[in-house]
Amino acid sequence: MTTPISTSRAASIVSSILPYSRYLKRVLENESELQQELLEQLHNPFTREEMLGFLQDSTAHLIDEADLHRLLRQLRKRVILRLAARDLAGLADLNEVMATMTALADVTIQFSLEFLHAAMVQPGHFGKPKGEKTGTEQQLLIVAMGKLGGGELNVSSDVDLVFIYPEDGETDGSKSITNHEFFLRLGRKLIASLNDYTVDGYVFRVDMRLRPYGENSPLAISLPMLEDYFVTQGREWERHAWIKSRVITGSSIAEAALMELIVRPFVFRKYLDFEAYEAMRSLHTQLRKEVDRRELHDNIKLGPGGIREIEFITQVFQLIRGGRDADLCIRPTLGVLQRLKQKQPLPEQTVEELIEAYYFLRKLEHRLQYLDDQQTQNLPQHSDDQILIAKSMGFTDYTGFLKHLDLHRQNVTRHFEQIFAVRRKAIKLGTFARIRPEQTNDNEIVKVFSNQLKTLGYIDPDKITARVQQFYDGTTFRQLSHPNQERILELMPTLMEVVTRFPPVEITLERMLRLLEKIGQYSAYLALLQEYPQTLPRVAKLVSISQWASDYLGSHPILLDELLAPSGLHTLPDWPTLKTELIHQLHHGNIPKAQIIEWQMDVLRHFQHAQVFRLLAVDLEGNLLLETLSDHLTALADLILDNVLQLAWQGLKKKHRKSPAFAIIGYGKLGGKELGYVSDLDIVYLYQDNHPDAMEIYTKLAQNINLWLTSHTSAGVLYETDLRLRPNGTSGLLVNSIEAFSLYQHEQAWVWEHQALTRARFVIGDSEVGEKFEQMRKNILCQPRDMENLKREILMMRTKMLEAHPNSTPLFDVKHDHGGIIDVEFIVQYLVLGYAHRYPQLTSNIGNIALLKLAGELGLTSAEKANAAFIAYRELRRTQHQLRLSGIPEATGTALPKDVSQKFARVTSDYLSSARRAVFQLWEDVFGT
């Protein structure tokens, strides 16, 4: 609440600030009745409600458009008087100034439109415009652009407007005209009500040049015309212009939402749009030429280091990332800067300096305009005005003021040039090897290229030259658009040099070329590599180590963005923080309702892919235990399942309670917390609910969950799922009550199903259902069993698994063959099922290594052999993991095809002989065979 100011104090304040505004002084001298009103209300901001009240109090006296013009101008005069006085006196901050001017524009436009529309549809006139398809009455959608759209209007600003109407059709009055003609006439009248200069002044100058097709086009167009324009003719600079667009009038929220469906996809691409850099450079170059031509170097908006450059900085990040990050799809410049500060695509100090400069420049802009109520951003040339401006900005002299101004402008210029630097021009020639497709048959040029490769350090330059020729001659490259071919050609010299740093060079080059083939159709990602050439060595390093990393990047090229700030790639995830971040992303998208599910699906996939990629980067550094990696991959899956369960439940139309009495049970690698990068999720769904429709509801919920996980969207898949471990397998019910599941486990389950239960755990969902499952699991595992029968059943199952995965090669299959991973898992499962009735601690879900150690400590098998076996198990899993990552099991001495090495992880029989021996010895100790 504002503190009242006495009239005498207010008079003193007004007197002190009048030298800084000749406009205020002139108005108060000519219209003395406004002075008392100003003194009485100086302590109060001029609110939207007060503006509306002023207009509505005079509605009864409005007869014609002349009355409307007069009333709007009287309001404008009062608002400017109080706002200027409050601002110059230090009673209003920048946010109040921008908000008040924006409110004035919104209120006057809306009031004027309502009055004029009502007059045009009166009986005996044109009548109401009706849509030819819907038959509903049509209203003019006025789209505020620029500073008005962003809620940051200055005190003597144009208002940039675009007029849209929903449908073509005709009016229903006696003087029927087309909707197009109706809204043209309405638009002209509205512009006149704001823009025309009368004895009472004006309200706002109106600029319509941002409308589709520009100033030579119709004043108003239909929504279908707008959509067609964006799809067929929309230009890059118009994406920049429409960032701040805001619908300020219209007949319904639905029409505003329709605008969102049309405008948002045009402005914000679904991918990371690094091409925006080049578009912004081009736009800024044009602006600089205009500044030079018009000699606007002292213009604090358009000149170097001015307001426009700050806006360009914020908007380039919005255009690049807004399609992925809805937090950046906001309008105010300061708001975007604050979010850039939080998200840190720019250093915090950079953002702070930009914010400080923006505040200073906008404050100065307003003081320049207060002088004579002129739309100017030029520094004054007359010495008297220079002194006034300096003092109004809090400086004793103009020299000191200029020094401070120059500091801000230099900061803005420096940051702008760093962000928009033409990095590609920095590629030096020297020894960089380059050859173009049309030159691959020119023997002389090919020879020069080969010599350049030799200089760079390539051992077999002729072979590499042939591979590059093959790349250029390949169908994939030839089918790319010409601009994308040129982008790749610009990248190639740098790529050829970078590859030499990461042996084995031939393999690294091959993977880089294949990666380029995969991402070559996406100009945005090629632009990323051009704008940030430092990412190329980071990519080369990853792919040189891992074929799987190369394939993953090729499948999800959006992950190249993760390499821009590599510091984040070298730290393990903070899951509580990431959980908060994911929830925010999922539920703060400001996405049209019709698109929200697709949006959330993509958010989940982008999040999951990014976390996997970050873990991969840490993993490839060689400092991450496989168990730790699996723990993190499992934590990621748990987090995804938690959110998917909630989203799937929210999406159910038929439900009878706030939250489901439902649990997701993890089996296999998910249950045992041993997930790898591409592991399926083995899942069973349970519920406990006596509602008569419970089975139907939870079946639909389970189907929805599976849909969320396995659907192929533009961002790929979250997880493949395996639901076959539920009671009766694929022929069984998709969901089971906890009672039915317990009965099945006690009376019908096979031994192999109890083996699977040893690795099961409650993952997410209703805690009561989860607790009952865990208790039931423990009861089942702790049942006394006939040891000979148990042994026979487990050995039979092991034989079946060997038959299902025959190995006809002389190589050792690390997972499936005897002495491998599955042998260890079967040993553990046998010990748990055989002895848990005596040692319930064996039912703890602590992983195979810890259970082997515990079995040895309990004397269930030789402690020495158990310890040797868990060391072997760790080595087997590590080898399997490394082979699948590399795609080339170099340790075997055999270059296997990728599909074989990655699917089966096989090595020469002598490579893991000590580990196999340890497993064999424990197997013999436990099973006697």
Curated annotation (Swiss-Prot):
Single Gene Ontology BP annotation: regulation of glutamine family amino acid metabolic process
The keyword Magnesium appears for this protein: yes
Keywords linked to the UniProt accession: ATP-binding, Magnesium, Multifunctional enzyme, Nucleotide-binding, Nucleotidyltransferase, Transferase
Segments for region (Adenylyl transferase): 429-929
InterPro entries: GlnE, GlnE_rpt_dom, NT_sf, PII_UdlTrfase/GS_AdlTrfase
Superkingdom assignment: Bacteria
Reactions performed catalytically: [glutamine synthetase]-O(4)-(5'-adenylyl)-L-tyrosine + phosphate = [glutamine synthetase]-L-tyrosine + ADP; [glutamine synthetase]-L-tyrosine + ATP = [glutamine synthetase]-O(4)-(5'-adenylyl)-L-tyrosine + diphosphate
GO MF annotation terms: [glutamate-ammonia-ligase] adenylyltransferase activity; [glutamine synthetase]-adenylyl-L-tyrosine phosphorylase activity; ATP binding; magnesium ion binding
Gene Ontology, cellular component aspect: cytosol
Pfam families: GlnD_UR_UTase, GlnE
Functional summary from the UniProt entry: Involved in the regulation of glutamine synthetase GlnA, a key enzyme in the process to assimilate ammonia. When cellular nitrogen levels are high, the C-terminal adenylyl transferase (AT) inactivates GlnA by covalent transfer of an adenylyl group from ATP to specific tyrosine residue of GlnA, thus reducing its activity. Conversely, when nitrogen levels are low, the N-terminal adenylyl removase (AR) activates GlnA by removing the adenylyl group by phosphorolysis, increasing its activity.
Family: Belongs to the GlnE family.
Protein name (Swiss-Prot/TrEMBL): Bifunctional glutamine synthetase adenylyltransferase/adenylyl-removing enzyme
Source species: Nitrosomonas eutropha (strain DSM 101675 / C91 / Nm57)
UniProt lineage: Bacteria, Pseudomonadati, Pseudomonadota, Betaproteobacteria, Nitrosomonadales
